[in-house]
A protein has these predicted regions:
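A feature for the membrane-embedded catalytic helix bundles of lipid/isoprenoid biosynthetic enzymes
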Residues: 2, 67-171
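Hydrophobic alpha-helical transmembrane segments of integral membrane proteins
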Residues: 4-5, 13-17, 131
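Membrane-embedded alpha-helical segments that form the functional core of polytopic membrane enzymes
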Residues: 10-61, 77-80, 96-101, 140-153
Length: 171
């Protein structure tokens, strides 16, 4: 295996390191550093999959590592926001519930392309960044309402997909 084949997983691993760094810098009011860490994490999130596909080194392990690093980063960022009083603690339960729903409906054998999961993850990353760039209460309320709408859409989409799949299997 060439050294280049490790690049995507190294980029993904950066998010595991970024999570506690963000937590520390945010809670210590080092917002510029926190934003820089978030931007770096978002860049690695975009690049890891792109580079893996370009180098033809995609793997199930890489896909799971990517989803897990996203989840860790998102939960840690929102935990910091909850500690600061920016969001209600229930947001963490919502995020964890949606992740568990994703895992339960995606299957544990092989990662699948899940557009709603991608949209939700992308929105959560955007929500983290917008929350720190525009920390006004009304902005966070709007972001939270949109998150609830996305989560409801995701749950309904999964419900109808599973129901339709069962109907097709019974034919």
């Amino acid at each position: 295996m060439s050294r280049q084949s490790y690049i995507p997983n190294i980029l993904t691993s950066v998010r595991f390191v970024a999570a506690p760094l963000f937590f520390y810098t945010f809670l210590n009011d080092l917002f510029l550093i926190s934003v820089s860490i978030l931007v770096l994490a978002l860049i690695t999130d975009v690049l890891d999959g792109y580079i893996a596909r370009k180098l033809d080194v995609t793997s199930d392990m890489g896909a799971y590592l990517d989803v897990t690093s996203d989840f860790v980063l998102i939960v840690v960022c929102f935990l910091a926001y909850v500690i600061k009083g920016w969001y209600d603690p229930l947001i963490l339960l919502l995020i964890i519930a949606m992740f568990l729903l994703f895992v339960a409906t995606s299957g544990l054998k092989k990662p699948v392309y899940d557009p709603m999961g991608k949209y939700l993850g992308g929105y959560l990353m955007l929500m983290i960044l917008v929350s720190i760039l525009f920390p006004e209460f009304v902005v966070r309320q709007i972001l939270f309402i949109v998150l609830i709408l996305i989560c409801l859409t995701s749950v309904l989409t999964r419900f109808f997909f599973i129901r339709r799949s069962k109907e097709l299997q019974s034919l």
